[in-house]
Amino acid sequence: MVGFKATDVPPTATVKFLGAGTAACIADLITFPLDTAKVRLQIQGESQGLVRTAASAQYRGVLGTILTMVRTEGPRSLYNGLVAGLQRQMSFASVRIGLYDSVKQFYTKGSEHAGIGSRLLAGSTTGALAVAVAQPTDVVKVRFQAQARAGGGRRYQSTVEAYKTIAREEGIRGLWKGTSPNVARNAIVNCAELVTYDLIKDTLLKANLMTDDLPCHFTSAFGAGFCTTVIASPVDVVKTRYMNSALGQYHSAGHCALTMLRKEGPRAFYKGFMPSFLRLGSWNVVMFVTYEQLKRALMAAYQSREAPF
């Protein structure tokens, strides 16, 4: 057995909620530069943006984007928006991942045998609910990642200032900009990510190919990351473009998608695919492995605390 052993008592909803948020923050700390590179590649090619996005710099590939940012803006630019990113994960992942099992049990009325329909419904529900809670943090994160440090063109100097500036200049609705594509994206992401992880893990365990241990969690998470990237990339690119756009640049998320298609062609919807996959694949591995271990560690600590002397 590698890592913490599974406990006799299943993890509580609170343990899952806190464990998911904490694990997601750890995953973000490790993979954030890849996410920033993804955002820069996704917005490349826009004729207009809300914040200065180093238009003179041409990004080519994941490594090229990272090296260009380090050379022109410094290493810290790779972590632009990290504070908002951690705020997002603590509120976002806690809901979409931490509540997934509880919502799945609700739809199956407590049955241990959840069908694919119940899993998809649970994933869509928690994904959409998480967006409603965490959208402002996502908007601020994307704005920070998109803006360049070089040449004094930074629009926001701090996370708190970003929230205030957006609310003052664009209204409260500005903080929920891009909610529609984000709801669509996260319903898709959650279904692809959690359901695929669920199914791969169940298949490996039922076929006795692996035990419920780190290698099983690693394999399931990596497979889920690849499937999710393929399915969700088009919506993710539209979401990023729309949230980073200037006031009035796009009338809606649909208008943003049509503009991309007309000006840049279908391939624009898969801009930043490689950093998306590298980020989502590695993020999934770190998050799910950490999440599984945190659940076991927290329940072991809880049981030892409750155990009689």
Swiss-Prot record:
How it assembles, according to the record, is: Homotetramer. Adopts an asymmetrical dimer of dimers functional form. Interacts with MICU1 (when methylated); leading to decrease the calcium sensitivity of MICU1.
Activity control mechanisms: Proton conductance is activated by free long-chain fatty acids and allosterically inhibited by purine nucleotides. Could be constitutively inhibited by GDP.
Annotated Solcar repeat ranges: 11-106, 114-203, 212-297
Q: What is known about what this protein does?
A: Antiporter that exports dicarboxylate intermediates of the Krebs cycle in exchange for phosphate plus a proton across the inner membrane of mitochondria, a process driven by mitochondrial motive force with an overall impact on glycolysis, glutaminolysis and glutathione-dependent redox balance. Continuous export of oxaloacetate and related four-carbon dicarboxylates from mitochondrial matrix into the cytosol negatively regulates the oxidation of acetyl-CoA substrates via the Krebs cycle lowering the ATP/ADP ratio and reactive oxygen species (ROS) production.
Effect after changing K271S: Reduces proton conductance to around 40% of wild-type value. Displays reduced long-chain fatty acid transport. Retains normal inhibition by GDP
Q: What is the effect of changing S276R?
A: Has no significant effect on proton conductance
Its GO CC terms are: mitochondrial inner membrane; mitochondrial membrane; mitochondrion
Membrane topology type:
Multi-pass membrane protein
The chain's Mitochondrial matrix topological domains, given as residue ranges, are 41-77, 146-173, 243-268
GO annotation, biological process? C4-dicarboxylate transport; cellular response to amino acid starvation; cellular response to glucose stimulus; cellular response to insulin stimulus; cellular response to lead ion; glutamine metabolic process; glycolytic process; liver regeneration
Q: Altering R267S: what's the impact?
A: Has no significant effect on proton conductance
Q: So which tissues is this one expressed in? A: Widely expressed. Highest in spleen, lung, white and brown adipose tissues. 4-6 times higher levels are detected in white adipose tissue of ob/ob and db/db mice when compared to lean littermates. Expressed in neurons of the ventromedial nucleus of the hypothalamus (at protein level). Expressed in thymocytes (at protein level).
Q: Where are the transmembrane segments?
A: 17-40, 78-103, 120-145, 174-199, 218-242, 269-294
Mutating K16S has which effect?
A: Reduces proton conductance and long-chain fatty acid transport. Retains normal inhibition by GDP
Under what name is this protein listed?
Answer: Dicarboxylate carrier UCP2
Q: Which InterPro entries match?
A: Mit_carrier, Mito_Metabolite_Transporter, Mitochondrial_sb/sol_carrier, Mt_carrier_dom_sf
Q: What is known of its domains?
A: The GDP-binding domain is located within the hydrophilic cavity, with GDP phosphates likely forming salt bridges with the charged residues, Lys-141 and Arg-185. The long-chain fatty acid-binding domain consists of an hydrophobic groove between peripheral transmembrane helices 1 and 6 near the matrix side.
- Induction conditions: Down-regulated upon macrophage stimulation with LPS.
The record's note on what follows loss of this gene reads:
Mutant mice are viable, have normal postnatal development and show normal thermogenesis in response to cold and diet. They develop glucose intolerance through reduced insulin sensitivity in peripheral organs. Deficient mice are resistant to infection by intracellular parasite Toxoplasma gondi likely due to increased macrophage ROS production.
